[in-house]
């Protein structure tokens, strides 16, 4: 697996190569279980901080259909393990034959040590519509999760492009706010 994105700005989470392979298999299995779950309550059992996420999931999926596998997976395209704000994190990008890639982010559960899906990242959940907020509609102040991806543009070690990722449906390529260099 080759990472297209450079995660070096996050501190690495050190695990052995064998542990990383086991974690990759585990994350693939957890992603499959999440996508195959019959309803939101069942899906929440695979979600990090599920008690906080379940009400958000219910609200979100009342307006949007749950993600489903409608194309055959091609397998993992990238996999990285690092630390985010003191939490071990595994980021997995899975390619599909006829549909957009899906990105999964897993955090290690502090209670049982299992790796759980960061649902808010996966669903690109936001409490209000991002476009309305940017256009000045709705609340004057709102809190959003904003994703930033740093992509290596060439073999030159310092040649990067930064993209802020706007909230949107998982796998959508129309999430970029603006490239920043």
Give residue spans per PLM region.
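Residue-level detector of functional hotspots within protein domains
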Residues: 78, 93, 130-134
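Short solvent-exposed beta->alpha transition segments
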Residues: 6-25, 29-32, 36-87, 165-176
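Short beta-strand edge/turn micro-motifs at domain boundaries
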Residues: 3-4, 98-155, 160, 172-175
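Short beta-strand segments that buttress and anchor functional surface loops
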Residues: 90-97
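Hydrophobic residues embedded in beta-strands of well-ordered beta-sheets
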Residues: 88-90, 114-115
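Ser/Thr- (and often Asn-) enriched beta-sheet segments in non-cytosolic proteins
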Residues: 93, 143-145, 163-165
């Amino acid at each position: 697996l080759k990472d297209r994105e450079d995660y070096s700005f996050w501190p690495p989470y050190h695990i052995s190569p064998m542990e990383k392979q086991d974690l990759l298999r585990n994350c693939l299995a957890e992603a499959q279980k999440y996508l195959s779950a019959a309803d939101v309550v069942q899906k929440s059992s695979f979600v990090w901080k599920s008690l906080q996420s379940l009400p958000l999931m219910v609200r979100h999926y009342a307006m949007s259909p749950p993600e489903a596998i409608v194309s055959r997976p091609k397998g993992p395209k990238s996999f990285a393990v690092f630390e985010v704000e003191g939490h071990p994190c595994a980021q997995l990008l899975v390619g599909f034959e006829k549909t957009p890639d899906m990105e999964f982010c897993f955090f290690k559960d502090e209670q049982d040590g299992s790796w759980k899906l960061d649902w808010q990242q996966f669903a690109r959940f936001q409490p209000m519509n991002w476009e309305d907020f940017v256009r000045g509609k709705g609340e004057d102040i709102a809190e959003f999760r904003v994703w930033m991806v740093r992509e290596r543009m060439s073999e030159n070690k310092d040649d990067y492009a930064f993209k802020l990722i706007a909230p949107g449906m998982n796998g959508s390529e129309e999430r970029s706010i603006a490239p920043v260099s």
